[in-house]
């Protein structure tokens, strides 16, 4: 599943291609993948709420899109130049639509295909005024950039008996951190992922929040991570893992800070990477 930096990269890329273009027709090939009544209108802008994209039209309607695990957005303009984002596959270069195409959005300048192999993603039409009240979006906590260190510390103390890693993965506590960026943020802040939230000091909470901001800023700047289920809006891969990742998927390699061997184990069912020396329990 793409994480916040990947979805932000997609938002920026697609904004260049479809903002000010007019949506003229919608073809629904899978009822499960489309919620609401199809609508036409000119794209005003594209917003992001956590890992969801919202395309605002000039008719007071919006399209909320969630790629989930294997969703793709592939835009073909009239010159047949193709821009693609999401789960990488031959669909990026193959003829479209195909057996994985769930929804087709036809614009005056080209066509946007929503493909989804596993049918977990969706497009939902709703009034623009109601977007922020949608149950999926309403439950999201503030993102790291929009949360104070004091508020973050208070939230952690409300879950004092929970381990820190699954707590910061909870989108109702802090929005945007997925598995990659949780590991990287905890490493940067010298915090073991199994520590109970009640043991985290105010200083440590502030350091962790700052680390999360820095990690995600770097990832957005580099176009996101390179994972098997994600590529950028122009079809190329992000290079955060290659350029900046210090522990994620680096098990067996030396810690860039102290030289100890990075190890991998599971926390709350999630693969977790740490330096056992820098992040002692």
Predicted regions mapped to residue ranges:
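Generic detection of long, well-ordered alpha-helical segments
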Residues: 1-4, 95, 146, 201-209
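A cross-family signal for N-terminal binding/gating loops and helix N-caps
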Residues: 1-115, 120, 254, 270-281
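Low-complexity, intrinsically disordered regions enriched in charged/polar residues
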Residues: 4, 63, 134, 146, ...
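Short acidic/polar alpha-helix capping motifs at helix-coil junctions
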Residues: 4-8, 15-18, 131-132, 220, ...
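Basic, nucleic-acid-binding surfaces and adjacent catalytic neighborhoods in DNA/RNA-processing proteins
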Residues: 22-38, 42, 73, 81, ...
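Short, glycine- and charge-enriched coil/turn segments that flank and shape catalytic ligand pockets
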Residues: 58-60, 131-132, 203, 260
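Phosphate/anion-contacting hairpin/loop surfaces
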Residues: 63-176, 181-188
């Amino acid at each position: 599943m793409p994480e916040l930096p990947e979805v932000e990269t997609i938002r920026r890329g697609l904004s260049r291609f479809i903002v000010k273009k007019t949506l003229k027709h919608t073809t629904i090939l899978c009822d499960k993948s489309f919620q609401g009544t199809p609508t036409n209108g000119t794209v005003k802008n594209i917003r992001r709420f956590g890992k969801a994209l919202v395309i605002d039209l000039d008719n007071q309607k919006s399209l909320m899109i969630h790629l989930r695990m294997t969703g793709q957005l592939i835009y073909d303009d009239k010159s047949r130049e193709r821009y693609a984002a999401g789960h990488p596959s031959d669909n990026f270069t193959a003829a479209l639509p195909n057996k994985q195409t769930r929804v087709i959005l036809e614009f005056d300048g080209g066509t946007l295909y929503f493909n989804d192999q596993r049918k977990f993603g969706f497009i939902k039409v709703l009034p623009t005024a109601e977007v922020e009240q949608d149950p999926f979006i309403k439950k999201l906590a503030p993102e790291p950039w929009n949360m104070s260190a004091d508020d973050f510390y208070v939230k952690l103390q409300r879950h004092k008996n929970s381990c820190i890693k699954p707590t910061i993965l909870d989108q109702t506590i802090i929005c945007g951190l997925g598995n990659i960026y949780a590991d990287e943020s905890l490493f940067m802040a010298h915090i073991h992922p199994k520590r109970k939230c009640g043991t985290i000091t105010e200083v440590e909470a502030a350091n962790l929040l700052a680390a999360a901001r820095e990690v995600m800023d770097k990832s957005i700047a580099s176009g996101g991570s390179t994972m098997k289920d994600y590529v950028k809006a122009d079809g190329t891969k992000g290079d955060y893992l290659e350029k900046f990742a210090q522990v994620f998927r680096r098990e067996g390699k030396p810690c860039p800070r102290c030289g100890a061997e990075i190890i991998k184990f599971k926390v709350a069912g999630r693969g977790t990477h740490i330096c056992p020396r820098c992040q002692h329990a």
